[in-house]
Amino acid sequence: MTKRVRITLVRSTIGQREPVRRTVRSLGLRKLHSMVEKDGSPAVLGMVRAVSHLVRVEELG
């Protein structure tokens, strides 16, 4: 069973390159301080790693 992670957008995508913006959008994050909960699959964790300078990640039980 994969762990769940809560991802919060804490920095704006203004001034970021287009691939970074698309990655943030594909994670389901739209506005600043928006949060989503996702399964901690390798695909999701790879996307989080690519935008780690913009998001905060918390592991859920």
From Swiss-Prot:
InterPro entries documented for this protein: Ribo_uL30_ferredoxin-like_sf, Ribosomal_uL30_bac-type, Ribosomal_uL30_CS, Ribosomal_uL30_ferredoxin-like
Matches recorded under CDD domains: Ribosomal_L30
A Gene Ontology cellular-component term: cytosolic large ribosomal subunit
Cysteine pairings via disulfide bonds: none
Pfam family, one: Ribosomal_L30
Signal peptide: none
Record's keyword annotation contains Ion transport: no
GO BP annotation list: translation
GO molecular function (one): structural constituent of ribosome
Domain of life: Bacteria
Keyword tags: Ribonucleoprotein, Ribosomal protein
Family the UniProt entry places it in: Belongs to the universal ribosomal protein uL30 family.
Subunit organization: Part of the 50S ribosomal subunit.
Protein name listed in UniProt: Large ribosomal subunit protein uL30
Species of origin: Treponema pallidum subsp. pallidum (strain SS14)
Gene: rpmD
